[in-house]
Amino acid sequence: MRENPYLVRMDVEDDCNFTTYNEKSGIYYRQFNWPVTGVMKDEFDCMQFDNAEAKPVGYHEHSFGTETFMVSQGKFLCYCMGSGFYLEPGDLLHIQPWMGHSFTPIEPNSRLNIMFMGINQFKGITEVRRRLTADFPGVFEDPEFQKVFVLKNGNAGHRTFPAENIVEPEKVSQLRKDGVGIREHDYGCIKLLLKIAKYETMGEKEVWDLYMKPGFYCDWDNFVQEYRLFWVMSGKVHCTVKTSATETLEFDAVADNTIVIPPFTPFRFEVVEEAHVRDLDCTARLQDLCEELDAWKAENPNAKMDREEMFGKFREFEFNATDIGCKCCDK
């Protein structure tokens, strides 16, 4: 049972919802976050492969839902839609329906962090497989059972492994290399890199990499129906969560910590040490907002947007922050 409901230290078993180690496959599995809302988004887990000889994830595809694969340690040889490439720390691979994909660890203790939407991976697939394998030997492996099971869970089945075909990373549109965004916006104390756009999540959310300098802060001092999920990749962020009208919980989040904020929960974060944070569930139209802000700046290169006008833009594009700034710049 985790001590802090808003913080998951990904290396601490007590902070995980579930952990298991399979000696046969050499995979250490950790479940960090259950799916939320009717679209079942934000399920987040990790597969750690003990050695390069551990059983790889075979080539397969899904008929619905999305999977986002992110490496936090080690290296993988991946195939997506027939093209092979390497997935390294900081990289992101976003898989949509009918995209064949596979993963083979090539370094010991390689970690593959996976975020799901619309699939119900653990409770609908992993837990069912564990229970049937333990209590009803042979049932899960039965071909007739598999025909029904994989269809119900959006698994369109395993595919023949592609012919060897290693390509340059830029030729794989589903791959987002570390430090590179689909679109990029630099505002001095914070640089935003769009990693996954709304058109890739059926309009549900965007995923952003935030590169922030010490003193940058953002405040959501309101009660909005939003789930928020942040993964600290490096640096340190200080968080303040209002737990009642008179009480707050404060804590620091560092590398390989996730910050989990449920709906109707006022919170704030402030950067303590230069940080790289991945916003895994941005429901705002943040790309649209940045385009608007950039257009205004181009027309007014020597001016600073009025605060009331800026927050009006925020609300127009569903970015619900109540305060934002940088202590270095605010002086």
Question: What are these language model-derived features?
Answer:
Residues 72-73, 89, 233-234, 273:
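A cytosolic small-molecule/anion-sensing beta-strand core signal
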Residues 1-43, 58, 133-206, 219, ...:
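A short, N-terminal "cap"/entry segment at the start of jelly-roll beta-barrel domains
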Residues 49, 102-165, 272-331:
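Double-stranded beta-helix
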Residues 35-45, 53-68, 197-206, 214-231, ...:
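A short beta-loop-beta micro-motif enriched in histidine and acidic residues
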Residues 68, 82-98, 229, 243-264:
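Short acidic-glycine-tyrosine-enriched beta hairpin
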